[in-house]
């Protein structure tokens, strides 16, 4: 893949002038963060002084898709060959991971410098940050906090750019880019709360990188299906679902301590025994809102055999659509049997197809999987539904992971998606018919786009998973699955059509699933801001449940000056973005 690296440079007059085009000298409300063109926006000299403080490491935003735009942008020139290569790679995380400013969500990339839309127009920053600091240690964080507080500039924290709620970018922002914090170490951790093997990783380490490192020492760890997600970033802090949840709990349940810099510039450790309220909040309450994470220490677990299974059937081969619906209902009823046995099935439901593309069962064999699935396969046979079922035994979790979510380091998953999440309460297993009806109608073939419900079966109930007191939303503890209402983003389709599909998700698909899952919630890292606008209250219960008010109180305590902001984080309702992207106090 062609590398499109962001350039380390000082502010140049040409770029500065482009940023101000049409808006120079604009006065704003003092309650708003400044953006380029405002009278209070820091001068070139001030940015140059910041660059000197950082020994020349300040990065000026240069969108990589500038190669597709007339005139390019900054140090990047228009280049048709490089544009073609970039478009081929655009759907995959590897195109974004080494950029200080790029994000993977199509909505927050906006169309200001897209390689697909409005390519006849000049490249502008739009929602991208203006500058970034490649964090090398706590001093860089303190420098950024002081600068943004002094000059009223928005502060942003970015790790890998896996961000579907826009928390890691923002118009006119100065970004703390934690990608270069790449340390990895297996340690013998000792504390009153836990003694045993653990891994300490820098904030820039991805889940796949952490897993590879742990496996060299005979361990596995709780990381995400997508290997390029930051292990110590929003993933673990947001809860973190995994193929290993039903055995080892949520990612946040495994965190032992956080090394952070707080809003007032203190460099400290938060654990179950020191700064325990901050530890509680960071472990499940979301990232980017209370402190900047430099490193995380988490449990690792002895590796071993992993039983696996796949299963598929479809409505076309079923005796009738009624039989297919009965099979889906029976699946929901059977699911608790699997997850109670420590298995986590990854499955997709379509209008006419059902697919379990992976079942992860640590400590089990292929024969165990056949035995475990036997009751459900018997149900399919009684319904005269033909199916394809396969099992295997992997000698280690790493080999199983590579076979299902690999190959590492990048894996198979695309970055450009439309989705929103919902947890399926275990209580529905006894009467799932309304759930099945809602799912099949939501993913119907006459809906705009190709939709599916993609789910992971889990059991992280506190009665079977030992975990520290943390801010993981209570909805997780009573769920039997976390699901995505999901469709791929199609860049070949006109922009207006993709906007309409997104609106369909917000107006039709998600409300239908919510209606049949009352009292449940959503994964705070996998949601669409159109579904959860910050000006409404639905996200508070969906993402945090009963923990919200305590988290809001800790925001006031640990960040009284509101140094940090993250969309739909506790306290974020105090802010709103205006029409030009300024972040303003309500």
Curated annotation (Swiss-Prot):
GO terms for molecular function: FAD binding; oxidoreductase activity. It comes from the Eukaryota. Pathway: Mycotoxin biosynthesis. Residues 1-17 form the signal peptide. PANTHER family: FAD BINDING DOMAIN PROTEIN (AFU_ORTHOLOGUE AFUA_6G12070)-RELATED, GULONOLACTONE OXIDASE. This is FAD-linked oxidoreductase orf1. Glycans are attached at residues 29, 51, 79, 110, 146, 188, 314, 321, 358, 402, 434, 461. Residues 124-303 form the FAD-binding PCMH-type domain. It catalyses: betaenone C = betaenone A. The gene is orf1. Pfam families: BBE (PF08031), FAD_binding_4 (PF01565). FAD-linked oxidoreductase; part of the gene cluster that mediates the biosynthesis of betaenones, phytotoxic polyketides involved in leaf spot disease in sugar beets. The first step of the pathway is the synthesis of dehydroprobetaenone I by the polyketide synthase bet1 and the enoyl reductase bet3 via condensation of one acetyl-CoA starter unit with 7 malonyl-CoA units and 5 methylations. The C-terminal reductase (R) domain of bet1 catalyzes the reductive release of the polyketide chain. Its EC number is 1.-.-.-. InterPro entries: BBE (IPR012951), FAD-bd_PCMH (IPR016166), FAD-bd_PCMH-like_sf (IPR036318), FAD-bd_PCMH_sub2 (IPR016169), FAD-linked_Oxidoreductases_BP (IPR050432), Oxid_FAD_bind_N (IPR006094). It comes from Neocamarosporium betae (Beet black rot fungus).
